[in-house]
Amino acid sequence: MRSSLAPAIRLMQSVSRDSCYRGFIIVMTFLFYTCYHLSRKPISIVKGQLHRNCSALPNPPNISENDTTWCSWAPFENTNYKELLGSLDTAFLVSYAIGMFFSGIFGERLPLRYYLSGGMIISGIFTSFMGFGYYWNIHALWYYILFQILNGLAQTTGWPAVVTCMGNWFGKGKRGFIMGIWNSHTAVGNILGSLIAGAFVSTAWGLSFIVPGIIIAAFGIFCFFFLVEYPEDVGCTPPQQPEEAKHDLENIPVSYNSTDTIFKSTESNADDSENAHTEVEHPQAISFIGALRIPGVVEFSLCLLFAKLVSYTFLYWLPLYIANDAQFDPKAAGDLSTLFDVGGIIGGILAGGISDYTGKSAITCTIMLILTAPMLFIYNYFGQTGISTTIAMLIICGILVNGPYSLITTAVSADLGTHESLQGNAKALSTVTAIIDGSGSIGAALGPSLAGVLSSRGWNYVFYMLIAADICACLLLARLVYKEIRSLCGGERKSYTEM
């Protein structure tokens, strides 16, 4: 007597070939960009080891008792160590911001698989060279700044490439919700990077860079062998873009629900799939100026500049603010600061889901930004009154600050890169993503730098700066919000990408 078919096999049979490939692409790109963030994190962990409080340690026999810097790593042992360590952050962030504007242009013109895998391998090499400085006993500041600059440039290959790949495989149906979940790779990478770097920092801080460097390089090799750039390359059905969806609506006498899950593709017969696999014509790349002319690109780019300024100021300064203002020890402050990342994951999913349901990404971002300003004010004055208040406020601030940031850098970028004004004759995903994220990276470089200057006068000034940046981000979306409100009043479910 035969048993029934195994449950797992029945499940496998119920999943279409297209869905399997799409799920594989989601997991792959998630892991790839997790590696990018994983390899960025070590510098923030190692800083405490480069300059230490040597007075708390017993002096070796050959070290004078008056030498209070013997355990620090030159040239970071002097009183200006904060400026020197800050220069490492600035070197990375500025080179990343500049390189991002060119990364998209190269990404559109080079094979995506080669571009992403090569960038990951090169980034792994440059990250490892930071760690080699420990074993080679290098104490020259220029060495570390040089490889921070080179690594910043190499890291620009990641974001445009993974967003382009996601955009190639998935239509607009539930892109915001799926990408909101997918965008949690940032927090996952930060957490893993902290754990891996922290495991070696006290014994041999060089490994805090070398191990993450090996990991991202290894995944770069995996990317080279397994990444599929377009669904047509493996005979899968490509996602419908706006113009194609309109054509189908005109010719098929049945209702079409644009919010159907992105994993369900239009049925195609074997001959169509075979033909698509045999002969794939990919569209022509778009110019930098051409990408700027796409409606919404400039507004969302400038909005992200200020939104990312707020987000990265929290990223670099939140642990110190918690330690100073709430009198937590550094470890507890660091643990509490991760709640901001947890809120960011929730905010990204929430913003993406609302955007999918309403089709109004500009309004979604603006509402969250409007709520952010008073919440920052409240957190500054009342957020440290108790541990429960601190936890709640950190999660809420993470939701409101990182929600718009996540939505703009993922679903909005992908939507604009497949805008209907392109009429199918140009691809712009990588270039648009690079322009938007590059603009945001300018804010990411400015925010922590300004916070360092203003914090010496008091933390209130830092929060005033963050509130002002948040208001600017709101105002920059005013035109798109106005158009979306008009479309709502007209009874249309029309987003900025169709204006």
From Swiss-Prot:
Tell me yes or no: is NADP among this UniProt entry's keywords: no
User: Which UniProt keywords are given for this protein, alphabetically ordered?
Assistant: Antiport, Endoplasmic reticulum, Glycoprotein, Membrane, Sugar transport, Transmembrane, Transmembrane helix, Transport
- What SUPFAM superfamilies does this protein's entry cite? MFS general substrate transporter
Which PROSITE patterns does this entry report, sorted A to Z?
A: MFS
UniProt GO BP:
glucose-6-phosphate transport; phosphate ion transmembrane transport
One GO molecular function term of this record is: glucose 6-phosphate:phosphate antiporter activity
Q: Which residues cross the membrane?
A: 21-40, 86-106, 116-136, 143-163, 187-207, 208-228, 302-322, 334-354, 362-382, 391-411, 434-454, 458-478
> Where does the record say this protein resides?
Endoplasmic reticulum membrane
**Which reaction is catalysed here?**
D-glucose 6-phosphate(in) + phosphate(out) = D-glucose 6-phosphate(out) + phosphate(in)
Residues linked to a glycan: N53, N62, N66
Keyword Ion transport belongs to the record = no
GO cellular component terms listed in the entry, alphabetical order: endoplasmic reticulum membrane
**InterPro entries, A to Z:** MFS (IPR011701), MFS_dom (IPR020846), MFS_trans_sf (IPR036259), SLC37A1_2 (IPR044740), Sugar_P_transporter (IPR000849)
Q: What does this protein do?
A: Inorganic phosphate and glucose-6-phosphate antiporter. May transport cytoplasmic glucose-6-phosphate into the lumen of the endoplasmic reticulum and translocate inorganic phosphate into the opposite direction.
Similarity section: Belongs to the major facilitator superfamily. Organophosphate:Pi antiporter (OPA) (TC 2.A.1.4) family.
Q: What is this protein called?
A: Glucose-6-phosphate exchanger SLC37A2
